């Protein structure tokens, strides 16, 4: 007879678990999550029947499934709401958009600008022809795919197709054409671009290794200890030379107050500093506002003067050249230059000027830029990645190992003797900063880059402003290369420096980079989808670009989540850079066009913002509490209220977007996985940029 366990159940009645319940955690009504679910314990089987246990488990499982379904429905609802909101925003921005072709055609400008518009339309027409051709070829390939023809069919296998009809004959001839005539030159061009790509990747890798070596060895420019200690102690024998501060500006009423307040609060003896506000504005309201700001600081005791040119030729270079011709400039030894949106900290001069002491070979000390709006939107985040690599790696490595780098045009201190020895500011290009740096290098002057001295500024927040800035930055170097190549060859600098200047500084980093980036990823890669006999390896399309993007993002580690958008956006910008490079190389009209980068007037971080606020309060107190606003301020406020924001529709980018998406469809038929995903996401990236859905809208 089987033993009875009733006595055991009675003795352990208080300690026996009757089964583990379902524990459900509810953070909010739309977010349910199950934490724990266990089957009844072994002891429960001793006191409860199997039938009750099965019923309870079924009920528990039903509740869990219902909760999971509720959570999934909540996620789908949230996703649908987000997509609907995104679609509404896209529709609203596109409805208010205007194409760049319409805008460029509507404006009446000089003959050079009209010629540039014609060349731009020609480039756009070529892209449209390429797009329509790809759509026709895609139709052929889809028809062939459903007929079951192999995309890699050889000549011998194609002979049986000749008698099947006109379409079969046309497709057969197309395959023979691409095998015998199109694939070989396309593969040759692809191989050439791959070689350029590898050379540029090697250059970037060497720069990164140089940066790692600098960090490992803790190498950085250090001024002589006595010059720093003299400045800190206020010794009468301290190195306190006469310093001229220049702020060139043109119709930049959003930022003039911040920059003027910043330079007027530089920590330097009042008798040894003079501030020049070089206003090239053609707007009377802006001129009045800047004059009033200068007059306010003059009342507060700052040595500041306002200059406005009658003859406004030469853009920024002409403005600086005119200011250097003033008679009192001969009394000054150094000149610090800041753009209108730059806000140096009070100790800027005390950190830069000491590097000149007892070293007559140093002609320039350049500080690093930092950005007050780097997290404003996706566009500013991607720009921050680029510029962080430029300063942390390129400028620092070239400074340490070569004593030469391109002057950034602002946040730098020049020895006036070096400027005069190099020929001063010239208006022959739109990159006057690079021009003077190259000429100073040819005359033997050395440069110092300070990675630990930062000067705050703004990044362009709209794609239109960023696009114009990049066009100027990439067309100017090609102009300069054509003009200064004979001088570089005839100069007395070493062969190694000539090689670095010609092949690395100009050709590789200014010409080859935008050329191969656009040609390889926007032209050759889509063509290889329709001419599969020419191939691009997967490591060229995916692995090496991903590695290079990883290296680029190292100086800005907080931006690591944006590595994929950064890679796609850089390829998207290759259209603008390639167009600018061609304009500068062949002296097209747009290469001579200077457009002031649009500013938003964002305040800097920390004490400077409080300082500006304090200065504004002081000004209001001086005017009187009941004093009315000036006429210029009223007009500026009225003009600001009239401004409306709109979108730009960029037709070239849209054409390339549809071209890449068409090529992605073709690669899907060939089952090329990596190529398909790259073309798909790159096409979407071009589509977003073409519809101006990245960055702020333009006023």
Swiss-Prot record:
There is a cross-link at residues 617, 620 (Glycyl lysine isopeptide (Lys-Gly) (interchain with G-Cter in ubiquitin)). One of its GO terms (molecular function) is protein homodimerization activity. Its EC number is 2.4.1.-. Substrate binds at residues 339, 341. GO terms for biological process: cell wall organization; plant organ development; pollen tube development. Probable beta-1,4-glucan synthase rather involved in the synthesis of the xyloglucan backbone than cellulose. Seems to work simultaneously with xyloglucan 6-xylosyltransferase. Xyloglucan is a noncellulosic polysaccharides of plant cell wall and consists of a glucan backbone substituted by xylose, galactose and fucose. This is Probable xyloglucan glycosyltransferase 12. It comes from Arabidopsis thaliana (Mouse-ear cress).
């Amino acid at each position: 007879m089987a033993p009875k366990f009733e006595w055991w159940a009675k003795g352990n009645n208080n300690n026996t678990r009757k089964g583990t319940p379902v524990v459900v955690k509810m953070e909010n009504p739309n977010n349910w999550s199950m934490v724990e679910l266990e089957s009844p314990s072994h002891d429960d089987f001793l006191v409860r029947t199997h039938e009750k246990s099965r019923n309870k488990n079924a009920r528990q499982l039903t509740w869990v499934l219902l909760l999971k379904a509720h959570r999934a429905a909540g996620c789908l609802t949230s996703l649908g709401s987000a997509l609907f909101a995104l679609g509404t925003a896209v529709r609203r921005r596109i409805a208010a958009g205007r194409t760049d072709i319409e805008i460029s055609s509507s404006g009446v400008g000089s003959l050079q600008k009209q010629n540039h518009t014609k060349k731009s339309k020609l480039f756009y027409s070529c892209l449209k022809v390429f797009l329509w051709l790809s759509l026709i070829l895609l139709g052929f390939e889809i028809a062939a795919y459903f007929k079951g023809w192999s995309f890699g069919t050889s000549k011998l296998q194609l002979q049986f197709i000749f008698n099947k009809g006109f379409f079969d004959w046309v497709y057969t001839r197309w395959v023979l054409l691409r095998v015998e005539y199109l694939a070989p030159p396309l593969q040759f061009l692809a191989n050439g671009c791959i070689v350029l790509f590898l050379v540029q990747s090697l250059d970037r890798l060497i720069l990164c290794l140089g940066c790692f070596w600098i960090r490992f060895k803790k190498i950085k420019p250090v001024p002589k200890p006595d010059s720093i200690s003299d400045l800190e102690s206020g010794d009468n024998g301290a190195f306190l030379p006469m310093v001229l501060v220049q702020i060139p500006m043109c119709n930049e009423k959003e930022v003039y107050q911040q920059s003027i307040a910043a330079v007027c609060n530089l920590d330097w003896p009042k008798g040894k500093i003079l501030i020049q506000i070089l206003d090239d504005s053609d707007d009377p309201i802006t001129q009045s506002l800047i004059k009033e700001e200068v007059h306010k600081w003059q009342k507060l005791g700052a040595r500041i003067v306002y200059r406005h040119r009658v003859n406004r030729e030469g853009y920024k270079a002409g403005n600086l050249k005119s200011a250097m011709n003033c008679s009192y400039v001969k009394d000054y030894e150094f000149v610090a230059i800041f753009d209108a949106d730059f806000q140096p900290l009070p100790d800027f001069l005390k950190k830069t000027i000491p590097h000149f002491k007892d070293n007559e070979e140093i002609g320039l000390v350049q500080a690093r830029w930092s950005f007050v709006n780097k997290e404003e939107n996706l566009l500013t985040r991607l720009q921050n990645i680029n510029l962080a690599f430029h300063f942390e790696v390129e400028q620092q490595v070239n400074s340490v190992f070569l004593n030469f780098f391109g002057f950034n045009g602002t946040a730098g201190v020049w020895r006036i003797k070096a400027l005069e020895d190099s020929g001063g500011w010239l208006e022959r290009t739109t990159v006057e900063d690079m021009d003077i740096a190259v000429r100073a290098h040819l005359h033997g002057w050395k440069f110092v880059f300070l990675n630990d001295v930062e000067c705050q500024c703004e990044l362009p927040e709209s794609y239109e402003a960023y696009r114009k800035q990049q066009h100027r930055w990439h067309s100017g170097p090609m102009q300069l290369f054509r003009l200064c190549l004979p001088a570089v060859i005839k100069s007395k600098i070493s062969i190694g420096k000539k090689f670095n200047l010609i092949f690395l500084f100009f050709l590789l980093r200014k010409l080859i980079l935008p050329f191969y980036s656009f040609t390889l990823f926007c032209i050759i890669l889509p063509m290889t989808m329709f001419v599969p006999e020419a191939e691009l390896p997967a490591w060229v399309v995916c692995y090496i670009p991903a590695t290079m993007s990883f290296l680029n993002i190292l100086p800005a580690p907080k931006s690591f989540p944006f590595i994929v958008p950064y890679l796609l956006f850089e390829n998207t910008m290759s259209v603008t850079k390639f167009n600018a490079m061609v304009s500068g190389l062949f002296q097209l009209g747009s290469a001579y066009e200077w457009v002031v980068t649009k500013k938003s007037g964002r305040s800097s971080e920390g004490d400077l913002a409080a300082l500006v606020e304090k200065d504004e309060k002081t000004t209001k107190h001086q005017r009187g509490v009941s004093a009315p606003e000036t006429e210029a301020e009223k007009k500026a406020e009225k003009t600001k209220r009239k401004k409306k924001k709109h979108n730009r529709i960029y037709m070239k980018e849209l054409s390339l977007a549809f071209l890449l998406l068409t090529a992605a469809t073709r690669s899907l038929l060939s089952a090329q996985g990596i190529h398909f995903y790259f073309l798909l996401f790159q096409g979407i990236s071009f589509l977003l940029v073409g519809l101006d859905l990245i960055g702020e809208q333009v006023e």
